[in-house]
Amino acid sequence: MKQLLDFLPLVIFFAVYKFFDIYIASGALIAATALQLIVTYALYKKLEKMHLITFAMVTVFGTLTLVFHDDAFIKWKVTIIYALFALALGISQLLNKSILKSMLGKEMQVADKIWAHITWYWVIFFATCGLVNIYVAFSLPLETWVNFKVFGLTALTLVNTVITVFYLYKHLPEDQRKELK
């Protein structure tokens, strides 16, 4: 259910864009992200930092898009969010306080070296996605960017999540692997 809620704003953004335009879709994205926070809090009595950061970025860049009637702001939002995720993961790893380990370490006990590999993998992934977003957003038609944002980045994230799970599974202690079978 939680994962479905995470996709709600994206689905609404895409649908509204297809029927209207980027400006109405940006307003819908702000509203849908606020609704996502409200529903998530109502169901789980907790909000994750990632959701709050995303909401703040959506609100700021969505509002700038509407006020200045310039879609460049909503396009930059994607790159800035990915850059923030890459920086947060990279800095936490440099400080030996892996965010990924703190999120998943209780369920999956693997060596710190493995957490470091995964963290740097995601740093590179987020940085690359941010750079590719800049290219697609400002070199290709708006419709191509919307499709890339909704389908391309979502698919890439899902594929990288699967790769991460398999990599973690490969390095789990034998007793933990048996529990997962």
From Swiss-Prot:
Superkingdom in the source lineage: Bacteria
Compartments, as annotated in UniProt: Cell inner membrane
Principal localisation: membrane
Pfam families, alphabetized: IspA (PF04279)
Coiled coil: none
Keywords: Cell inner membrane, Cell membrane, Membrane, Transmembrane, Transmembrane helix
Protein family: Belongs to the YciB family.
Entry-linked NCBIfam families: ispZ, PRK00259.1-2, PRK00259.1-3
Protein name: Inner membrane-spanning protein YciB
Species for this entry: Shewanella sp. (strain W3-18-1)
High-level lineage: Bacteria, Pseudomonadati, Pseudomonadota, Gammaproteobacteria, Alteromonadales
